[in-house]
Amino acid sequence: MSLVEIIEGKARILIPNYKDYMKDGKFDPSWAPVFYNPKMILNRDLSVLAANVVKPKSLIDGLSATGVRGIRYGLEINGVEEIILNDIDSDAVELIKKNVKINDLESRAKIYNNNINSLLHEIKVDYVDIDPFGSPAPFLLSSFSAAKSKQYVAITATDLAALMCSSKTSARRKYGLICNKMSFSRELGLRGLISKAITEAAVVEKAVTPVFSFYNDYYYRVIFKVERGAKKVDRQLSKLVYYYECPKCGYRIESEYLQQMKCTNCNLVMQTYGPAYKESLVDYEFLNNMISELDKFSYFQTFSKLKSILLTIKDESKYSENYYRIDFLASLARVNVPRRDNVINCLVDASRTHLDPLGVKTSKNLDEIKECIKKLSSRNTS
């Protein structure tokens, strides 16, 4: 395996030479013997920023591949005393060893060639990071088991086809979801992922609360705070609901029960999604701490984009309702789609959402949003 060196964050990382694995002039990271995805740099930048808020003394990068994520934690977060890097693939482990050495982390790094679930059941750390190719569902129970009380677990999910209902059978198998596409499916997918995490953690009597959640390109990223106690677990389980939306008029409702719900306006059977987490997707204090710390990381390759995402999330987190998609409501009203910023100005109390370029978050009700869309559309055509 020939290698090339790249720089990411403060780390020097050896990765497989992509030119050796190209097919018909194209390259996919999964074709290389050890996986490295440059499209996930923003994910890793954000993860370093969030972990800097947590300041763990011990952590595990459970599915390490090249080791880039765990190595960056060791180099870019003050106070990390122990970094556990693990991969089940022996080629990956050999590459991790090389990368740990060239970054002078041998005294703090422990490298394993284990099944990640087995390893997680043997350790206790302050911060667990699971970044799989696909679903994190098989690793949730062991991840929460490995996290110390009042510490953190961070997960990535790239199987959005399941979480956003393109594959209803996968949604049921992997996440226990009753899954129908709705106008705000990107938010529901995130809430469905959090719901699965809460129910898995409950098995080991741990209550998990999302302190930061976001969507980018083709994945979700969620950071959970983990606490012990049956009563806390029960409180989190009580925050799981089913969402219903009318495909004809856009009317929405939530219920703690799974049932066939009919729209009170149209008498049509409503689309169903759940169980899904109904509370805030971020902890406001944690988010503000991330924003406050960001300037320390101006060297991030994705600094500008990351700052924009965080500020948008700060704005939208003021609103408890799920986002509304402008083109969906415009199509129901049979009018042209107005610009999002114009809709926000019309509503006054509203913001963009990072989840969807056509989405708005607002305190206003459905009828008020529709009225703004109609009014703006009539101006454009007059």
Swiss-Prot record:
Zn(2+) binds at residues 246, 249, 263, 266. Keywords: Metal-binding, Methyltransferase, RNA-binding, S-adenosyl-L-methionine, Transferase, tRNA processing, tRNA-binding, Zinc. Pfam families: TRM. It catalyses: guanosine(26) in tRNA + 2 S-adenosyl-L-methionine = N(2)-dimethylguanosine(26) in tRNA + 2 S-adenosyl-L-homocysteine + 2 H(+). It is an enzyme of class 2 (transferase). InterPro entries: SAM-dependent_MTases_sf, Trm1, TRM1_arc_bac, tRNA_met_Trm1_C. Its EC number is 2.1.1.216. It comes from the Archaea. GO terms for biological process: tRNA N2-guanine methylation. S-adenosyl-L-methionine binds at residues 44, 69, 87. Residues 4-373 form the Trm1 methyltransferase domain. The keyword Methyltransferase applies. GO terms for molecular function: tRNA (guanine(26)-N2)-dimethyltransferase activity; tRNA binding. PANTHER family: N 2 ,N 2 -DIMETHYLGUANOSINE TRNA METHYLTRANSFERASE, TRNA (GUANINE(26)-N(2))-DIMETHYLTRANSFERASE. Dimethylates a single guanine residue at position 26 of a number of tRNAs using S-adenosyl-L-methionine as donor of the methyl groups. Belongs to the class I-like SAM-binding methyltransferase superfamily. Trm1 family. This is tRNA (guanine(26)-N(2))-dimethyltransferase. The lineage of its organism: Archaea, Thermoproteota, Thermoprotei, Sulfolobales, Sulfolobaceae.
